[in-house]
Design a protein with these regions (language model features):
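Conserved beta-strand hairpin/beta-sheet module of binuclear metal-dependent hydrolase folds
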Residues: 4-64, 153-156, 160-164
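Metallo-beta-lactamase
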Residues: 13, 96-237, 241-246
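Short, flexible loop segments at the rims of nucleotide/cofactor-binding pockets, characterized by
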Residues: 20-26, 77-79, 138-144, 211-215
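Short catalytic-loop micro-motif centered on adjacent basic/acidic residues
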Residues: 44-47, 73-76, 139-140
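Short, glycine/acidic-enriched loop or turn micro-motifs at the edges of active sites
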Residues: 50-51, 81, 169, 242
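Active-site metal-binding motif and surrounding structural segment of the metallo-beta-lactamase
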Residues: 53-101
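Binuclear metal-ion centers of metallo-dependent hydrolases, dominated by the metallo-beta-lactamase
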Residues: 231-273
Length: 273
């Protein structure tokens, strides 16, 4: 069994109590990354996945040794089906009145159409945070229009892990769980093939994704301002590869800040409006 097969079958602990529950789709250019945070007898599931992903995600949850009823919160960073599509199945397996959904009011309007059962909380109404019984804290920060009006990110203060939703996501046919950016990336404008390694550039598909998915330069720059104020050790995006280590994080932040032509600004620059 190769490494990819191992990753597809088992939860991968990427930081203390944080498990990647995703699945590699082979040649697909869009990989989805649900995450589970386990703290004591409680757990939080982040961006739980699509309907078709449910069996893989739940198998990995069970293989952590967790009982589904220990999941107390479902965090959805926006309302797309690749995040929320398996909500009905999750509710059936978790099956506890203690379960609540945390998102933004703008998102909850649409999440309601997946299921009306579970109470939905606007993260702003709980002081922008969720605190486990142990004291471990998840902090929420708004990143509006990256890409939905109610988009936000989640920061685990214990491990300094940022769950960035679509930010730092990627269209990537040569996917790996962790990306590996070269220090030379700091001065590179991201070609499809890296001039240093001769391999596919890991930044190029990140740039393509942001130019197509985010709404505007202004929205992306605001989100970067929010994130650069945090002490981040790793970034766990909802698509693409995980960035681990401060150098990797800073290289990616630096690249996105000088990207340009994002969303509506791309169409304007190409005179396509």
């Amino acid at each position: 069994m190769d490494q990819t097969e191992q990753q597809n079958l088992n939860p991968i602990e990427i930081a203390d109590g944080i498990y990647w529950l995703g699945y590699s789709y082979g040649s697909s250019s869009l990989h989805c990354n649900p995450y589970l945070i386990v703290e004591g007898d409680e757990a939080v599931l982040i961006d739980g996945g699509s309907r078709d992903d449910f069996s893989y995600v739940m198998l990995k949850i069970l293989r952590t040794g967790l009982k589904p009823a220990q999941i107390k919160r479902l965090i959805y960073h926006h309302y797309d089906p690749d995040l929320c599509g398996n909500l009905l199945q999750m509710e059936a397996m978790i099956n506890t009145p203690e379960l609540h959904i945390i998102s933004h009011a703008e998102n909850n309007v649409f999440i309601h159409y997946y299921s009306r059962k579970t109470p939905k909380i606007d993260y702003r109404s709980i002081n922008n945070e969720f605190v486990f019984e142990s004291g471990r804290r998840l902090a929420f920060y708004g990143t509006p229009f990256c890409h939905a009006p109610g988009s936000f990110v989640t920061y685990d203060t214990k491990t300094k892990t940022l769950f960035s939703s679509d930010l730092f996501g990627s269209y990537d046919t040569e996917w790996a769980l962790f990306t590996d950016l070269n220090p030379a990336c700091e001065i590179c404008y991201a070609n499809q093939i890296c001039p240093v390694t001769g391999k596919a550039c890991p930044l190029y598909p990140i740039g393509q994704f942001h130019q197509h998915i985010m709404t505007s330069n202004a929205a992306l720059i605001h989100a970067l301002d929010v994130m650069e104020a945090l002490d981040i050790e790793r970034i766990a995006p909802q698509h693409g590869s995980i960035l681990s280590g401060k150098q990797q994080v800073q290289l990616a932040l630096h690249y996105l800040r000088r990207l340009g032509d994002v969303g509506i600004d791309y169409l304007a620059s190409e005179k396509m409006l």
